[in-house]
Amino acid sequence: MYKKFFDGVIEVITGPMFSGKSDELIKRIKILTYADIKTLVIKPSVDYRFSQCEIVSRSGLKIPTFLARTTQEIRDLFTRDNYQAIAIDEIQFFDEEIVTFLEQIADKGIRVIVSGLDQDFRRKPFGSLPNLMAIAENVTKLQAVCSLCKRAATTTARKVLNEAQTLIGDQDEYEARCRACHSL
């Protein structure tokens, strides 16, 4: 029933913006670091909000990271060293090829931990994350607080007029909403 720590596994951390996904990812990376498990940490190069060289959470936690634009760049970084784990923040910004790559390395005994949005601002599946959730051994779905009614928020609402699915932003562009308060 339980896997050994070094059995390959895929873990997904998801939820709306402002739910603590990066905090949870950094916490799990630090546990691996304490255990001397060599971990490749990645974030997409398009995520420039807080730092170009670190994953930074809104609570102030931070951890050094490599930047990548494509799955091929991640693959190249991964093969440069003898990594035992890989952690990727904002996974929804990578191409669909990432699902196959992460499944392949998990099958070889690598621990995979990813975080990101599973829904876009329209509450539609976002990027590769829903497909990763389908094959993951562990899915943690976090909640935020609805900016309007203060109930549990499970969605991210866009506050600015822009129809593009991807718009990098923060509190000026987005807020967490519950199902009842989320209007398109």
From Swiss-Prot:
Entries under InterPro entries matching the protein: P-loop_NTPase, Thymidine_kinase, Thymidine_kinase_CS
Record-level GO BP terms: DNA biosynthetic process; thymidine metabolic process
Broad EC category: transferase
Main location: cytoplasm
An example molecular function term from Gene Ontology annotations: thymidine kinase activity
Keyword Nucleotide-binding: yes
EC id: 2.7.1.21
Keyword Endoplasmic reticulum: no
Any one GO cellular component localisation term in the record: cytoplasm
Assembly and oligomerization: Homotetramer.
Family: Belongs to the thymidine kinase family.
UniProt name for this protein: Thymidine kinase
